[in-house]
């Protein structure tokens, strides 16, 4: 049954989840994607009591999400929904295991080609996954890193062989890649100081400020 309802998951998971909520959500989303329909759901998050709670608005009412689903993806053992949140003109990613009370709507979904950053092209999932290695939702950009050469394999594993190398020395090399900005930022934070963002300047400046704040937080 799972296989018949998972044609929109990429890549297919090696280990299958035993979470009944996830199975149910996948089946509903698969059906909605096939029918090109919007869905409505509620979304849960952890609180300090270590239990899941539905996200709420400021007035205390439960927040409802109306989205157009395009694809599901597995990243680091977690299932993600790639979709368009109806209020906006871009892509959002949601954890499938945190979706609650999902239902398919009669309204037709928003075609991917009409979204900002789509280039009026159908969704290329391989490219999307390369650009969104941490499944963040933000604008894509051409990012240039300076890395230690020991990181080359990690860079290719993470971003694929579409990266460009330049300015190579015995110890360092520059890397240029078209990638999701938040993913680039997280990558640089994870591997600092072995990875340094060179361009774009706004991202370099933001990372420098964030790392400075992190350093100050550890000062006595």
Each predicted region: which residue ranges?
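Loop-centered beta-sheet repeat module
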Residues: 30-92
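Bulky hydrophobic/aromatic content
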Residues: 1-52
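A structural signal for short hydrophobic beta-strand segments in well-ordered beta-sheet cores
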Residues: 72, 102, 165-166
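Polybasic (Lys/Arg-rich)
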Residues: 122-220
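Well-ordered beta-strand positions in beta-sheet-rich domains
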Residues: 64-66, 93-96, 144, 174-176
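Short beta-strand-initiation
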Residues: 24, 60-62, 66-68, 140, ...
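Flexible linker/loop signature enriched in Pro/Ser/Thr and Pro/Gly
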Residues: 88-125
């Amino acid at each position: 049954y799972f296989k018949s309802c998972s044609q929109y998951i990429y890549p297919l998971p090696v280990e299958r989840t035993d979470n009944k909520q996830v199975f149910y959500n996948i089946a509903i989303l698969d059906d909605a994607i096939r029918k090109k329909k919007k869905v409505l759901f509620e979304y849960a998050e952890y609180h300090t009591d270590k239990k899941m709670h539905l996200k709420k608005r400021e007035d205390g009412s439960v927040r409802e999400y109306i989205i157009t689903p395009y694809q599901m993806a597995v990243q680091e053992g977690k299932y993600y929904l790639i979709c368009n949140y109806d209020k906006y003109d871009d892509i959002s990613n949601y954890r499938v295991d945190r979706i609650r009370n999902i239902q398919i709507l009669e309204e037709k979904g928003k075609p991917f080609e009409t979204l900002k950053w789509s280039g009026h092209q159908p969704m290329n999932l391989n490219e999307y996954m390369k650009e969104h290695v941490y499944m963040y939702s933000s604008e894509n950009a051409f990012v240039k890193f300076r890395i230690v050469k020991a990181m080359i394999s990690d860079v290719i594993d993470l971003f694929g062989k579409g990266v460009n190398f330049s300015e190579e020395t015995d110890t360092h090399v520059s890397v240029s890649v078209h990638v999701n900005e938040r993913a680039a930022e997280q990558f640089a934070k994870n591997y600092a100081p072995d990875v340094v963002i060179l361009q774009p300047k706004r991202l370099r400046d933001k990372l420098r400020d964030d790392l400075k704040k992190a350093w100050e937080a550890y000062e006595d």
